[in-house]
């Protein structure tokens, strides 16, 4: 279901789940920001942006899990991107963000950029989160199924990018395929994942 409003407490729970994710010995996205709190604050800004833009969905009214995605040809306009951009600048430094951008470029072409260049349609997932009180109860599968169902309906793949091997392994377990790995040096690694659509009986040819 589409999320139309959230309390600041609910937004913070998503930010905290990201900012304080246990990366073990991996680097994770916090390397691009000024620590765990700054990462959590940036994610809160991201959530506010996708909420304003109408891109945020949840598993139920209880909000166990959330997913933000955009359909083919959808654009994230200024009202979506402005809070996200402000969140980046408030929780990092311009120097660090520039270094992060250079590291991404050196890491190679992303799956999203490759598909854009090839003019292939896809659903792009920008955020997946299960609130900490609901983790380990199967909600990650349920939240991903929201985007997967859209991919099946439209006949297009679902793609996303994640910042930890442990997260990547979970996505693979839940039906996605690893489509590429990018070494960002001191900023860690990024993993491209894809899930191809399953054809419905109506779409199958005899």
Q: Where are the regions that the model predicts?
A:
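A short beta-loop-alpha structural element at the N-terminal edge
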Residues: 1-16
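Active-site rim helix/loop that mediates acceptor-substrate recognition in acyltransferases
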Residues: 33-56
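Conserved beta-hairpin
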Residues: 52-70
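Conserved acyl-donor/pantetheine-binding loop and adjacent beta-alpha core of acyl/acetyltransferases
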Residues: 66-128
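Conserved GNAT acetyl-CoA-binding A-motif
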Residues: 122-123, 150-163
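Conserved beta-strand-loop-alpha-helix junction that forms the acyl-donor binding cleft
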Residues: 126-135, 159-169, 186, 196
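Conserved acetyl-CoA-binding loop-helix of GNAT-fold acetyltransferases
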Residues: 130, 136-149
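Conserved active-site alpha-helix within GNAT-family acetyltransferase domains
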Residues: 141, 153-155, 164-181, 185
């Amino acid at each position: 279901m589409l999320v139309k409003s959230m309390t600041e407490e609910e937004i913070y729970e998503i930010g905290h789940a990201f900012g304080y994710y246990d990366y073990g010995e991996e680097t994770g996205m916090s390397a691009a920001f000024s620590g765990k709190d700054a990462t959590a604050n940036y994610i809160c800004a991201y959530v506010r942006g996708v909420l304003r833009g109408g891109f945020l969905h949840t598993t139920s009214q209880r909000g166990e899990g959330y997913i933000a995605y955009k359909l083919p040809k959808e654009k994230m306009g200024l009202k979506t991107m402005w809070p996200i951009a402000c969140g980046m600048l408030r929780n990092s430094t311009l120097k660090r963000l520039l270094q992060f951008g250079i590291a991404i470029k050196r890491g190679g072409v992303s799956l999203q950029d490759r598909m854009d260049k090839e003019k292939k349609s896809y659903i792009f997932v920008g955020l997946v989160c299960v609130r900490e009180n609901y983790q380990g109860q199967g909600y990650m599968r349920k939240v991903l199924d929201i985007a997967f169902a859209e991919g099946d309906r439209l006949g297009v793949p679902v793609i996303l990018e994640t910042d930890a091997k442990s997260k990547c392994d979970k996505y693979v377990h839940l039906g996605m395929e690893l489509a590429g790995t990018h070494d960002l040096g001191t900023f860690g690694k990024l993993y491209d994942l894809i899930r191809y659509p399953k054809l419905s009986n109506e779409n199958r040819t005899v």
